[in-house]
Each structure stands twice: as structure tokens, then as C-alpha cells.
Amino acid sequence: MKLDITVIILTYNEELHIRRCLENVCPIARKVYVIDSPSTDNTVEICSEFSNVEVVVHKYPGNQAEQFNWALDNVKIETEWVLRLDADEYLLPELVEELYS
């Protein structure tokens, strides 16, 4: 069962990290948005392998707070909760268990 969570991940050339992050959050999140800045590596191609991931390319405005706020204002969020992750982060099993409880 997926949680009522939308995950927003900001990326720029994160091909070394993004797969692990997505493999971790895609099974539990209803929707995952990757806001790409735009990458010149295989970040976007890796993201396209996941069915509940939508990549939105947006030029990096200069800091992550602005990029995240842009995402909140411009992507369709239909869940009760939003979780922001970096591409090199993942959820520990204990946190996932807590989210389900």
C-alpha cells in the first residue's frame, strides 16, 4: 500500500545516487517529482525507469530553497503530505515503519 505522500527530489547530475533514492521511496509514495536543474548525465534517463516518477526540468534559480518552493507552486500535489529528499538520501526501514503506523 502506498502512503498519501508526494516526494520532491531536487537533482543536478545525480546519476550516481538517484537510483537508490528512487528504489527506496517509489514503493511507498503515491507520487515522486524529480525537479532537475537540468542534468547533463543520465539522471533523467534513470528516473524514467520508475512509473510513479515525473521529471520536471527547471533551471536552477540559485539555491535549493527557491527550487523547492518553485516545485511546491508548480507541480500537482494531490496528497496530504509532501516529503523533500536529496538524491543521495533514503528512508531507513524504521522511518518507513513509523510512516505506516
Annotate the PLM regions:
Residues 71, 79-90:
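Short beta-strand-to-loop acidic/aromatic patch adjacent to the donor-nucleotide binding site
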Residues 45-74:
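Conserved donor nucleotide-binding strand/loop of the catalytic core
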Residues 19, 41-49, 94:
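Acidic helix N-cap motif at the loop->helix transition within catalytic regions
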